[in-house]
């Protein structure tokens, strides 16, 4: 009997010791798998002096406000064209131009974000409004045969957009030296490649730009989404474990697009626009990074506007849904800014503040570095699951 009890006690002791050892190993492994960084609060807020987003320049000849064509000044004409790309590919495009406007006028090429692709379904209201203020616009289709959820090549996309840029620069009535670009969201990454390749662009407008890499932006967006959904902190703390994992083996190399490298090419007059209801973008941090990069490149002609609007600068919902109206001042501000900078307005030539609008409130910081822990690749996890 004693021997049986003894064996039971020994077995229990061994089992307990083994359980403790396994617990310690699993705890150590869990700690090793956790990145040494977390999402931090954002505190470097931008202070605005006025909620008025109006943009006006000073006429150097008179000292008064520069008079430029206003929205609705011209009737517009729409022309559907085909743009030839490399490899025998083509995309459709729409040119909108002001009728009876003076020659040598400004022009603007539009670059799609991730949510749009067809020229017939995107930017129609913005592009037509610009045209009515004397600015010729070109909206091409996004090339989609090499654009998927797993593969996106922003450098190649910039090369494709350059074909449309050349057509626009040669369009009748357009001044080549007064032609610039307008990009939204994901398209702003492509825009910075285009500004590097074409530093002679007259201007660049970046609306709702992520600024940081896709991996870094997604960390911020996921944190804000889970916070809004009421997720506990323990769940939100899992985000760095996921977003730090390498994705190249799965084809998601574009998540690590070198945004910092390309934003140094913003040497031309720059307009940055954000909707303060956009929680997916680093609305204050991104603006500071862009202004810093432009300034370091010798460009101080940077205007920043914040609107009481969503990611698409539309009102009526914080979410991106079809059919919403644009923020009522938005297109007017775009046109006034383009007409001013193409008239020669420099950093010291503005009659209105260079930073204005609705006060933003970015709550968390998009991490600028996301080093992984022990497990470095999403492919390792996928492979382990497959084996199991």
Regions found by a protein language model. Give the residues of each.
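Alpha/beta-hydrolase-fold serine-hydrolase catalytic core, especially in secreted/extracellular enzymes
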Residues: 6, 300, 309-312, 316-388
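N-terminal cap/lid segment of alpha/beta-hydrolase-fold proteins
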Residues: 44-103
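Short, surface-exposed "cap/lid" segments of acyl-processing enzymes
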Residues: 92, 99-130
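Conserved alpha/beta-hydrolase
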Residues: 127-147
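Alpha/beta-hydrolase active-site loop
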Residues: 151-172
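Primarily recognizes the serine-hydrolase "nucleophile elbow" in alpha/beta-hydrolase
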Residues: 167-226
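Short beta-strand/loop motif that positions the catalytic acidic residue
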Residues: 266, 272-274, 278
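Conserved alpha/beta-hydrolase "acid-adjacent" motif
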Residues: 279-286
């Amino acid at each position: 009997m004693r021997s049986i009890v003894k064996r039971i006690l020994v077995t229990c002791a061994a089992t307990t010791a083994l359980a403790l050892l396994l617990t310690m190993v699993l705890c150590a492994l869990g700690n090793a798998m956790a990145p040494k960084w977390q999402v931090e609060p954002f505190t470097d807020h931008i202070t605005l002096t006025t909620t008025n987003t109006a943009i006006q320049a000073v006429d150097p000849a008179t000292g008064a406000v520069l008079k430029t064509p206003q929205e609705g000044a011209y009737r517009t004409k729409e022309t559907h064209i085909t743009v030839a790309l490399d490899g025998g590919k083509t995309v459709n495009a729409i040119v909108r131009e002001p009728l009876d406007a003076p020659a040598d006028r400004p022009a603007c090429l539009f670059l799609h974000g991730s949510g749009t692709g067809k020229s017939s379904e995107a930017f129609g209201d913005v592009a037509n409004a610009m045209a009515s203020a004397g600015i010729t616009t070109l909206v091409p289709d996004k090339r989609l045969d090499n654009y998927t959820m797993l593969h996106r090549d922003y450098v190649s996309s910039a090369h494709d957009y350059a074909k449309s840029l050349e057509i626009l620069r040669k369009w009748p009535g357009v001044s080549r030296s007064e032609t610039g670009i307008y990009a939204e969201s994901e398209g702003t990454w492509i825009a910075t490649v285009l500004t590097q390749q074409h530093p002679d662009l007259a201007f660049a407008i970046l609306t709702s730009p992520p600024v940081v890499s896709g991996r870094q932006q997604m960390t911020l967006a996921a944190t804000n989404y889970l916070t809004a959904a009421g997720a506990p902190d323990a769940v939100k703390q899992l985000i760095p474990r996921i977003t730090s994992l390498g994705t190249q083996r799965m084809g998601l190399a574009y998540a690590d697009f070198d945004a910092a490298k390309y934003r140094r090419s913003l040497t031309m007059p720059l307009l940055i626009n954000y909707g303060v209801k956009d929680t997916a973008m680093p609305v204050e941090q991104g603006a500071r990074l862009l202004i810093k990069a432009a300034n370091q490149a010798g460009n101080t002609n940077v205007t920043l506007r914040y609107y009481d609007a969503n990611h698409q600068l539309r009102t009526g919902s914080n979410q991106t849904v079809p059919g919403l109206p644009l923020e009522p001042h938005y297109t007017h501000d775009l046109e006034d800014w383009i007409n001013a900078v193409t008239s020669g307005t420099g950093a010291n030539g503005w009659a209105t503040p260079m930073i204005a609008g609705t006060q933003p409130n970015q709550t968390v910081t998009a991490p600028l570095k996301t080093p992984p822990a022990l497990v470095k690749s999403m492919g390792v996890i996928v492979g382990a699951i497959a084996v199991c």
